[in-house]
């Protein structure tokens, strides 16, 4: 692990109860780390995981990194104060989104496991940036291997049985999303975020009862 400190942090106002996963969305890992360490950027993350699995530590866990922005999850409106932010090097949808290499996923999995164990974080609170800011963000995206985390009990699995309830409605679905944790002020954005994570092969924003 490499220590590369960012000046962009503050004091937490909430205990750590979440992990928020991002992709860097820049053309290289070095560019992303430079940006996160730049005072002018006003953004940061606790950790960056490069494509070769190298782990970079940028903000101490007890401090509030600036990674989630305007966000909401399960009643928390200051996700930065409640979370550990992990940036995963990937060009993202703007610069050539691609699968996450095995070495990178191995490091992400080990890091998440350690943080879950250290802070007693519930798997429901291991989330993506798109989960907490669905109207603004789409990372870590549909190629991220959530199933790898879920198999280890580090994140929530997608239900294995699909039910189409004759009494199902858009309002029922959005209410279920809200109970799960999503902010539903923008219902379609929340639906897309849910699909991106749990039905990544068909992200159409349609509420179809699946």
Regions picked out by a protein language model, each given a short descriptive name:
Residues 77, 92, 97-185, 189-210:
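Basic/polar, cationic surfaces and motifs that engage anionic cell-wall
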Residues 1-124:
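Active-site-adjacent loop/helix surface patches within enzyme catalytic domains
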């Amino acid at each position: 692990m490499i220590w590369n400190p960012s000046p962009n942090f503050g004091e937490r106002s909430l205990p750590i109860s979440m992990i928020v996963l991002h992709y860097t969305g820049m053309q290289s890992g070095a560019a992303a780390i430079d940006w996160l360490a730049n005072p002018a950027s006003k953004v940061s993350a606790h950790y960056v995981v490069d494509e070769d699995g190298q782990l970079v530590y940028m903000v101490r866990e007890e401090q509030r990194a600036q990674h989630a922005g305007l966000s909401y999850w399960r009643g928390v409106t200051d996700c930065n104060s409640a979370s550990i932010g992990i940036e995963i090097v990937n060009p993202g949808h703007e610069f050539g989104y691609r699968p996450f290499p095995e070495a990178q996923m191995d490091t992400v999995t080990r890091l998440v496991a350690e943080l879950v164990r250290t802070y007693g974080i519930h798997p429901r609170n291991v989330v993506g940036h798109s989960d907490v800011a669905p109207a603004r963000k789409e990372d870590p995206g549909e190629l991220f291997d959530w199933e790898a985390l879920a198999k280890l009990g580090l994140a929530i699995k997608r239900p294995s049985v699909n039910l189409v309830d004759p009494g199902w409605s858009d309002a029922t679905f959005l209410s279920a999303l809200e109970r799960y944790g999503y902010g539903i002020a923008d219902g379609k954005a929340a639906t897309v975020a849910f699909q991106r994570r749990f039905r990544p092969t068909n992200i159409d924003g349609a509420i179809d009862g699946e």
